[in-house]
Amino acid sequence: MEHTYQYAWIIPFVPLPVPIAIGVGLLLVPTATKSLRRMWAFLSVLLLSIIMIFSADLSIQQIKGSLIHQYVWSWTINNDFSLEFGYLIDPLTSIMLILITTVGIMVLIYSDNYMSHDQGYLRFFAYMSFSNASMLGLVTSCNLIQIYIFWELVGMCSYLLIGFWFTRPIAASACQKAFVTNRVGDFGLLLGILGFYFITGSFEFRDLFEITNNLMDNGGVNSLFLTLCASLLFVGAIAKSAQFPLHVWLPDAMEGPTPISALIHAATMVAAGIFLVARLLPLFTVIPYVMNFISLIGIITILLGATLALAQRDIKRSLAYSTMSQLGYTMLALGMGSYRAALFHLITHAYSKALLFLGSGSIIHSMETVIGYSPEKSQNMVLMGGLTKYVPITKTAFLLGTLSLCGIPPLACFWSKDEILNDSWLYSPIFAIIACFTAGLTAFYMFRMYLLTFEGHLNAHFQNYSGKKNSSFYSISIWGKEGAKAIKQNSVLSTMNNNESAYLFSKKTYPIDGNVRNMMRSLITITNFSNKKTSPYPHESDNTMLLPLLILVLFTLFVGFIGIPFDQGGIDFDILSKLLTPSINLLHSNSNNSVDWYEFVTNAFFSVSIAYSGIFIASLLYRPVYSSFQNLDLINSFVKMSPKRIFWDKIINVIYNWSYNRGYIDVFYTTTFTRGIRGVAELIYFFDRQVIDGITNGVGITSFFVGEGIKYVGGGRISSYLFLYLFYVSIFLLIYYFFNL
């Protein structure tokens, strides 16, 4: 066992040979390197699998009751200061290692087929391997300096991955937005690290916790300064995990390839912020104001993320806001001190969200054979619908991921979210009400995504989307100004209508005529793909993409059982509590996670009822009515006879506009900060060029003309020099005489 821990330092370095070899190979032997590109994908999966096996062994040792292991190498700079580097293996590290490696392997296998058509295939796997290495280094770090180094590397990898298609202006802008937003958080994190070094004189976690506790007990530190430093540390996590108000980069990060989105949202970048708060939670717990701040940010993010997801049309951006909201639950749990529930939800959400993102990638991949390569179209749920019969395996996987995120038992997220909701009632009834209401919103917008994508008819075959005039396939009215107006006026919280009620879909069916079929055949050729097959209908993805989906389905079905909170009949399923026992004792020394069946069912009934309510409302509004209800007249008469119909339409329009425009937060940031900073920069530029440069240039020009004047005065005659000398002497004598009167 000791040998296992002694060699744990190698974990972050195992994936590095792939990006190094690819980089050197492309420089020295580019042709051979490109011809063996599948080998690099296999090597990436193999190396990460080795780490997964190693991490599983470490986790087993932790479950058996092994203590925390830390190995440190000291680098002495002088007698007063030294830097220590090493690695820390504890329950939190073990959980994160398993999470990163399992999700990473699934994403790499999936990417082999998904990126097979892309010319940047090798660059993609180099970035992915380096990103995995950076995240592994982050979770094994034993001090704040190491964490900050790998923190920046994770941010750099995310910048490269989000901007992978950097030739697209929107992708280049998205990676810059993510980079700048995270610089705000990173600056706060750096200030917090320096502040705690000033307070404690150490970067090590153990010293940091012990010294801070002693100083708090003895009153040896200014509590306001300590709170400020701890809040600055948390600012880094706010930006990394896309919490309010530094969440604006997350939806734009969807401009990268879909496997990148799955990795960032499940196991790397956004998980890094949660990991940082979990790692420093013993420090935060002694500062009540910081814990309240963490829970406040969490509950705001929960509600904001859910409301912003309500009216999104892009399937990946909808999932991005879902990630934002679900990580808000995790942050809320950490702020409440529910360490176990927070990590439990981080695990269950990671597998469910990886399944959903890879499922959305399969959907996008199938839609590209119909629509062509255009992310704006292939990711838009307006053009989907009726995919059940075309991609049945993807549909089943996506449905299970959706139900899991909705909180339907016995899927993974049900167990963790239910635990957070129960703890929230003990912490704050107001927070609990908001969290429960948002659980219903989550079920609503997730099932909305599912219904718009898989139910009804394939909308990409419609020749006319607005129902007003004919348009060509690549000038669909919804993408233009007129179509946008029609949608805004006639559709509320719905992505399509045909001059029908805002609440209901049209009963009409739309047969595909010959002109549309001919038009489709001429437009579906995808020149960027090596596979030149064309089809007027989507098709199921290849087995290489379906295999990770099926494995993640198993995780979604069964990973929740590691944290079942009840112990009956001598059967203890709660593996998670066994693994986290050393960390839980640090915060809740007298806690008992086990509950009986009656208490569990009572607590779960309320949350499941809320989830089913959200699903029912989504089905009522977004499921095609001709497949759900026989009595259409009854429903339509109910809608028309309502005396407050206009009032409710106005309210729903406000909600729709709020959601679709991202809560106007991006507009506010653009107007206030971006344009404000640019205005200040232009003012400084004007002052520099006109005032500073004007003074400098003015002195130079004045000196030049004075010199020119003197040049003409000095003609070489001694009498002229004598005259000027006597003239200036006389002037100085007069001045002297005047001031001495």
Curated annotation (Swiss-Prot):
EC number of the protein: 7.1.1.-
One BP annotation, GO: ATP synthesis coupled electron transport
The keyword Membrane appears for this protein: yes
Localization per Swiss-Prot or TrEMBL: Plastid, Chloroplast thylakoid membrane
Catalytic activity: a plastoquinone + NADH + (n+1) H(+)(in) = a plastoquinol + NAD(+) + n H(+)(out); a plastoquinone + NADPH + (n+1) H(+)(in) = a plastoquinol + NADP(+) + n H(+)(out)
Chief location of this protein within or outside the cell: plastid
Cellular-component GO terms for this entry: chloroplast thylakoid membrane
Highest taxon in the source lineage: Eukaryota
One example GO MF annotation: NADH dehydrogenase (ubiquinone) activity
UniProt enzyme class: translocase
UniProt xrefs under Gene3D superfamilies: 1.20.5.2700
Membrane-spanning parts: 9-29, 40-60, 89-109, 125-145, 147-167, 185-205, 219-239, 258-278, 283-303, 327-347, 354-374, 396-416, 425-445, 546-566, 600-620, 721-741
InterPro entries in the record: NADH_UbQ_OxRdtase_chlpt_su5_C (IPR002128), NADHpl_OxRdtase_5_subgr (IPR018393), ND/Mrp_TM (IPR001750), NU5C-like (IPR003945), Proton_antipo_N (IPR001516)
Family from the record: Belongs to the complex I subunit 5 family.
Name used for this protein in its record: NAD(P)H-quinone oxidoreductase subunit 5, chloroplastic
Organism: Nandina domestica (Heavenly bamboo)
